[in-house]
């Protein structure tokens, strides 16, 4: 999924293992790693999308994080940021805190996105499906991608993000201050 990002895209990733994996896969100044703030990634992404309407903004969070702040989904839909793609990695667990089961096996997050008013909702369960759901450029959003995933228990746990929250904030603010490329120019 990270390969689908353009150098001008902003990525906000939720706390825990998702931010750790994003950081390990390739740190960028336009990545904002939420450290210790579960459930707030989508709200931050909405703010970035509204601030920078000509840049694609992707938020990456788990099912536990998304369910902690379900009220953000209708807020995102009401604001209608065409440049926002909201990706939920749904493994039906709070993986970062010990893999306790979540309730997403009984809650259809895609249907909640549709009922909230997201312009596009995709449900995927493969890498090919994820690639198709994240097209180059950014068709009218907001878009929600709910990806059912299964974690391999033998995979290594990525190292912690080595930046301090202050460093993450400062460099992301600097990236926001840079000129951005329009979504459809890429």
Language model region names:
Residues 1-7:
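Active-site pocket-lining segments that scaffold enzyme catalytic pockets across diverse folds
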Residues 8-28:
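Acidic-glycine-rich active-site phosphate/pyrophosphate-binding loop
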Residues 10-15, 33-36, 59, 122-125, ...:
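General beta-strand structural signal in soluble alpha/beta enzymes
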Residues 15-18, 91-93, 148-153:
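Glycine-rich beta-alpha junction loops
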Residues 21-91:
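Thiamine diphosphate
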Residues 89-99:
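Long, charge-dense
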Residues 100-134:
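Conserved thiamine diphosphate
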Residues 139-186:
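Glycine/aspartate-rich loop-and-adjacent alpha/beta segment that forms the canonical ThDP
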